[in-house]
Amino acid sequence: MLGWIVGTEWFPYAVKVTDDANRSLAPYSGKYFRATAEATPFESWLASMLEVLAKKELEYAWQHPVALSNWPTTDPLSHPDEANEQEDLVSVDPMHVEPTSAWKAGYFASYHIYPAYPDFMRYEEKYQDYRTVEGKSDPYAGYLNELRAHHEGIPLMTTEYGTSSARGMAHRGFLGRNQGMHTEAEQGRINAELLDDIYDEGLDGGILFSWQDEWFKFAWNTGDLEVPANRRPMWLNRLTNEQNYGVITEPGESIEETIHLDGKTDDWDERTGSRSGFGGLVERLSDRLLGRVPEVRQRRYEDFDLSVSHDEAYLYLFLQKREGEWDFPDEEINVGFGTLPGGSTKADKAPGLTFPGGIQFLLQIRGEKGSHLWINSAYDPHTWLYGEQLGHMPDPVIEKDPRAGVFLPWRLALNRPLELPQSGRKIPFEDYEVGRMNFGITDPSDPEFDSLADWYAEGGVLEVRIPWTMLGYTDPSTLRVWDYPYEAGKIEAVRNEDLRVYPAVQSAGNGQISVEPLTYAWKGWDQPTYHERKKKSYTILSEVFEDHDRVKTPLR
C-alpha cells in the first residue's frame, strides 16, 4: 500500500451542477484536511472526503499519502481553443485543498494524462509551440510543463499514461501518438517517450496504464457495436482501443490452441486433428469428448482447401493450394461473408462473382499493399450514422438496398467536426479505413512479428484473421450480429445461427464464377478461454524503467 487516490475522472457537468447548487457553502475545515478560501463547493466537498479517509485510516493507526483524482478535462488550466465545451467547462484544483499539520503522511496532485485527448492537446497553440530541452515540438511535454508550474509546492504525479496496441483507433494524436492502431513495439516506444516527458518536466512519478488488457472496456466509436454491453468481458474486441492498453495481452484460446499467421500448418493441424500417429488420434478424440477443441469447418474447392475456425477475438481462414504457390497480384482472392439472411449476390468490387444466399462483407486479397475488407452499403453503420443521420460525411455513398451490390470501405470515426473557439479554425470530420488489411506474421517469437497483421501468405498457404466487429458481430459468444441499420433505424443486435463463407480465386480469363459457401457455426460460450503473454512493449518499458528510478529536478 503506497497511498490513496480519491475519486474518479470527474464528469464536468456533475461538478458544475454541484457548484451551482451550493454556492453559499463555506470552505470545509477538518482536523486533517481543509479547503482554502478560493475553493469551490465541489472542491470543499472533496476536502471533506479526504477527512473521512484520514479518520478511517487512523482507526488502524496508519497514515498514507493521499491525492484527489483528476484529469485534463477538469484541470485548473485555461484552454481557450478547446472546441468541446465540457473539456474546459470547470476546474477542480488540488491547490484549493490542503492538509493540516496533523496530517503527516503528505498530499499530492494526481492526473490521468494521455497524449491524444482532449483535443486541446492536439490544437492548442501554446502546446504546439512548446519545445523540449532537446528542441523538439512536443505538446504532451508542454502540457506537463504548465501543469507542473501550477502545482508549485506539492508533488505532482501522472497516475495514468499510456497508449493502446489495438487493431482499431479512436482518436489521432500529435507525433503519431494515436489512441490505438500501434504495434506492440510502437506501443512500447511511445510509452517510453511519454515517461521521458514526465521525467524531464520534473513531475514526481508516473503510473503506466495498464498492466493487462481489459476486455470489459468500451470506446466511443465502437461501443454501440458491442451489444449486449454486459457481455463485453466474454470476447476481445481488437477494434476497441480501450481494451488493449496493457503490456500483458490475453489472447483468446489456450496457448496450445493459438493460431499464428506464419505460413505454417502445425497450428491448423492441431485443430483439425491432422496430428500423425495413433496417439495423436486418441488424444484428439479425448479432447473433443471433453469439449477442449475449437470448432473447425473444412471444404474442398477446385484448386484449394478452405478451413475456418475462431477464438474469442478473431475469425480465422486457412486456404491451402493443392498445387503450386499463391501468386499476387496475378491472382486475386475474394471471400464473401454472409452474416444475415439475404444481402447481395453480386459485389461491385468483385465483378464476375456470384454469391448465392447473399453477403454483407467482401474480403479482397490482392497483395501486400492492395488488400481490403469491404462492407455492403446497406449494412454499413458508419455511413448510416455519420453520413445519413448526422450529416458529417461529405458526399457519402448511401445505398439502402442490400441487394444492390454496392460495397464501401470499412471505416471508423475518429472525431466529429470541430470549430476551435479562439482561432475560428474549422476541423472537418475525421475517420479512417479500418478495413485496410495488413500483411504480416503474428507469431510473437518471429523476428518479423507484427501484432497488427491481418493476413499472411507463404508458398501455397494463406492465413487470415478478422476481428469479430469487422464481420458485423456485436457478441460472438451469443452469435449476435447487428441488423441492417437503415431498416432498423438504429444499431440493433439479432441472433444469427451461422456464417456463410464464399471463397473464390480469380485470375485473368476466369469469366463468371458462382461460389458455393462453407457454412460455419459454433457453440456460444459463457466462459472465455485465454492465456497471458508479455507484449513487446513490456520488454521495452522494463529497460526504460531502469533509467527513471528517481525523481528528477526540472531542467528549466
Where does each model-flagged region fall?
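Surface-exposed, glycine/proline- and aromatic-rich loop segments on solvent-exposed faces
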Residues: 274-279, 287, 295-420, 478, ...
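Conserved, mostly hydrophobic/aromatic
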Residues: 4, 53, 109, 160, ...
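Glycoside hydrolase catalytic-domain groove-lining segments
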Residues: 87-175
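Aromatic-rich peripheral "rim/lid" segments of glycoside hydrolase catalytic domains that contact
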Residues: 173-176, 186, 197-274, 282, ...
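Short, well-ordered beta-strand segments enriched in hydrophobic/aromatic residues
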Residues: 263, 313-322, 460-468
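Active-site groove signature of glycoside hydrolases
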Residues: 1-40, 61-72, 204
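A solvent-exposed, charged loop/short amphipathic helix patch at secondary-structure junctions
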Residues: 17-44, 123-135, 169-182
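An active-site-proximal structural segment forming one wall of the substrate-binding cleft
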Residues: 1-12, 41-63, 89-101, 193-201
